[in-house]
């Protein structure tokens, strides 16, 4: 139990001190730390890999519980075959993806390179290249802080949506009601990936959308694509010191297209239902826009914040990535307020130009965007 700067455990490397910091390496330690803080009416902040978190320069005046439990356990093979795997919440997500390929657990290869821990993936329903983690999650075991009991959610009970779940929707005094302890995954077996759904990835693999490829090759191509956009952590590349995509792709009523340029890209909003999201239905009332397109066409180019008048916003300490417009990066000595300032400028500019409100993807603590 110590004081710790949150900049030391977040990928954007910003954030002031935690009044109390606890690194919990087992399920029992996690439950004890959270329960004790709750019993003392102490504010609680749950941190996994710190890749989706921005804390203000003032820090957090409460208890930070750093989830550091690790381990992967193969469970008895289910009646339907395949692989059933239980993973501790603090396990590094990308390490688990690599293991899944070695074990020929088919499915998550397209989610390679995403920073953070396994426990965070169901909260956000992490996704990339047309694949979402909800497609492979069987259940999630949690600690329910409201009633001080363990609670396990089956896939269908998690209410997965676009970067959303019941775990994200329920809060206790500003932090999650349900603390993820373990995640159970169910995979089919084989060396081939799930069908490739994303055109850019399919092209790099030399296959058509809907076809499969070797999972190991999919991982290699995804890591290369992400690295080209500064989306794989690299100590020598300042573009990777970020929270990844800062804004979600806006979901708007179909009628909103009438006020946007004809060439503004839009995509169907697909709702997944049934076990593992096997049933899909397209919304007739809403569409998904491209946040990157909106940002760029509102006048914000790669590297916004580094040169010219835009440098005055954060003194060049923070900027949009020089590789793409969706990430806000720490150029070396940024404060949290510098990140927030760039975010506010971009958000206001898009709203003024297109009338669309961008929604931040990372959790923001004690800051204003």
Question: Can you say where each PLM-predicted feature lies in the sequence?
Answer:
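Anion-binding (especially nucleotide phosphate/pyrophosphate-binding) glycine-rich loop
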Residues: 1-147, 157
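Phosphate/pyrophosphate- and phosphate-bearing ligand-binding catalytic cores of soluble enzymes
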Residues: 8-11, 150-328, 333-337, 353-369
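Residue-level signal for inorganic ion chemistry
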Residues: 26, 50, 116, 148, ...
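Short amphipathic alpha-helices in soluble, non-transmembrane regions
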Residues: 33-37, 197-201, 342-346
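Generic non-transmembrane alpha-helical segments
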Residues: 36-40, 99, 221, 294-299, ...
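Short, low-complexity, polar/charged sequence segments that are solvent-exposed and flexible
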Residues: 40-43, 65-66, 84-87, 104-108, ...
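Beta-rich strand-turn-strand
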Residues: 102, 335-342
């Amino acid at each position: 139990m110590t004081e710790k700067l949150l900049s030391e455990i977040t990928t954007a490397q910003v954030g002031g001190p935690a009044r109390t910091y606890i690194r919990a390496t087992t399920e029992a330690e996690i439950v004890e730390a959270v329960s004790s803080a709750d019993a003392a009416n102490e504010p609680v902040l749950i941190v996994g890999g710190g890749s989706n978190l921005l804390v203000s320069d003032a820090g957090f005046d409460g208890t930070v519980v750093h989830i550091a439990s690790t381990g992967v356990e193969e469970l008895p093979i289910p009646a339907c075959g395949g692989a059933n795997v239980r993973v501790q919440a603090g396990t590094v997500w990308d390490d688990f993806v690599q293991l899944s390929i070695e074990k020929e657990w088919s499915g998550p290869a397209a989610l390679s390179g995403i920073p953070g821990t396994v426990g965070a993936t169901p909260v956000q329903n992490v996704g990339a290249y047309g694949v979402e983690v909800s497609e492979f999650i069987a259940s999630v075991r949690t600690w329910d802080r409201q009633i001080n009991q363990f609670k396990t959610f089956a896939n269908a009970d998690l209410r997965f949506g676009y970067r959303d779940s019941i775990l994200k929707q329920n809060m206790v005094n500003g932090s999650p009601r349900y603390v993820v302890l373990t995640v159970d995954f169910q995979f089919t077996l084989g060396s081939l990936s799930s069908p490739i759904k994303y055109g850019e990835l399919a092209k790099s693999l030399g296959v058509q959308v809907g076809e499969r490829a070797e999972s190991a090759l999919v991982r290699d191509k995804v890591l290369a694509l992400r690295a080209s956009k500064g989306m794989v952590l690299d100590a020598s590349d300042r573009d990777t010191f970020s929270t990844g995509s800062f804004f979600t792709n806006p979901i708007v009523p179909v009628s909103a297209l009438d006020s946007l340029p004809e060439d503004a890209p839009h995509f169907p909003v697909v709702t997944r239902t049934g076990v593992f999201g096997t049933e899909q239905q397209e919304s007739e009332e809403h569409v998904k826009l491209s946040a990157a397109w909106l940002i760029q066409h509102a006048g914000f180019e790669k590297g916004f914040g580094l040169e010219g008048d835009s440098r005055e916003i954060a003194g060049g300490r923070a900027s949009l990535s020089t590789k793409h417009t969706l990430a806000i990066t720490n150029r070396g000595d940024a404060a949290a307020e510098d990140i927030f300032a760039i975010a506010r400028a971009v958000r206001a500019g898009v709203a003024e130009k297109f009338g669309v409100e961008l929604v931040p993807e990372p959790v923001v603590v004690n800051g204003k965007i």
